[in-house]
């Protein structure tokens, strides 16, 4: 079954989801809505990307549609989500990627336009949260769901393996995260987060994140046992999680890596991966996995206390999971 997808919000994630959909056999984007840009500009931003390069397919416009590789995708510019005519374009599964409509109440407005389900491409305060490979099988038919954050998608599969094999007593995470659109190019006012107002390309910026705590939402046994913070760094893409944790069942670093390899080649194939190469962040650009464990970067102090390092392309890999979750929900048919 191919899920007919609509995208609301054609920013970083919206466009990367769109690009990903052309190599995702179970999803098809049939409509895009963004009230802040015209169709000509949408096509331009889709075609050219400073981080991921030029789109491999031909892109042009035909009236109010974007045409990619001969395929027409309707483009609308409606501000009110309740008035977006998803049904007219056959869009049933809506990826809400504006960053604005992140609660069940706000995102549910899409249902009025004919949507069947809404997948929020961000954490949500009240929508059920799912991470592929971790808890998607608990999906029970909710009309609005969250795909969590890119960092939670990196951390949760890794933590799942550690917890199921060795038992995670507690953990602290630091996400070394590429800068994003919410940050400032030069020092500028940022009333709620003073540090966040400093120039993104000139500073290492400590920041709060709910990504680690969110692991407790997708792995309930770890509620209150994992937390963390982030440091925004002057790179445009690719981030890395540094997880330090205490294990209930002692194991050598080699035994832990063996468990990770088994999971990456087994039940978490396509989601969790690993590398034994001397990689740096740019080597991970375009990697479709949620979490790529850097075997050489991890260390163990003793059998019960260790640090695991795992990379993720916070744009490309995350967008892939958004489509995977969308396809899964469509296949379940609840």
Swiss-Prot record:
One short Pfam name that applies is Gp_dh_C
Q: Which residues cross the membrane?
A: none
Q: Name one GO molecular function term.
A: glyceraldehyde-3-phosphate dehydrogenase (NAD+) (phosphorylating) activity
Q: What superkingdom heads the lineage?
A: Eukaryota
Provide the binding site for D-glyceraldehyde 3-phosphate: 149-151, 180, 209-210, 232
Gene Ontology CC terms:
cytosol
Q: What happens when the gene is disrupted?
A: Does not affect the biosynthesis of heptelidic acid.
Against SUPFAM superfamilies, the record matches this protein to: Glyceraldehyde-3-phosphate dehydrogenase-like, C-terminal domain, NAD(P)-binding Rossmann-fold domains
- Keyword rRNA processing among record annotations: no
Copy the pathway line from the protein's UniProt record.
Carbohydrate degradation; glycolysis; pyruvate from D-glyceraldehyde 3-phosphate: step 1/5
Q: Cite the entry's keywords alphabetically.
A: Glycolysis, NAD, Nucleotide-binding, Oxidoreductase
Where along this sequence does the record place binding of NAD(+)?
A: 12-13, 34, 121, 314
Q: Catalytic activity, per the record? A: D-glyceraldehyde 3-phosphate + phosphate + NAD(+) = (2R)-3-phospho-glyceroyl phosphate + NADH + H(+)
For the site Activates thiol group during catalysis, which positions are given? 177
Which EC number(s) are documented for this chain?
1.2.1.12
Question: Which InterPro entries does this entry report, sorted A to Z?
Answer: GlycerAld/Erythrose_P_DH (IPR020831), GlycerAld_3-P_DH_AS (IPR020830), GlycerAld_3-P_DH_cat (IPR020829), GlycerAld_3-P_DH_NAD(P)-bd (IPR020828), Glyceraldehyde-3-P_DH_1 (IPR006424), NAD(P)-bd_dom_sf (IPR036291)
Q: Which family does it belong to?
A: Belongs to the glyceraldehyde-3-phosphate dehydrogenase family.
The record describes its quaternary structure and partners as: Homotetramer.
Biological role stated in the UniProt entry: Glyceraldehyde-3-phosphate dehydrogenase; part of the gene cluster that mediates the biosynthesis of heptelidic acid (HA), a sesquiterpene lactone that acts as an inhibitor of glyceraldehyde-3-phosphatedehydrogenase (GAPDH) and a growth inhibitor of the salt-tolerant lactic acid bacteria in soy sauce brewing. The GAPDPH hepG/gdpB shows much higher resistance to HA than the GAPDH gpdA located outside of the cluster, but it does not seem to act in self-resistance.
Report what the protein is called.
Glyceraldehyde-3-phosphate dehydrogenase B
Q: Which organism is it from?
A: Aspergillus oryzae (strain ATCC 42149 / RIB 40) (Yellow koji mold)
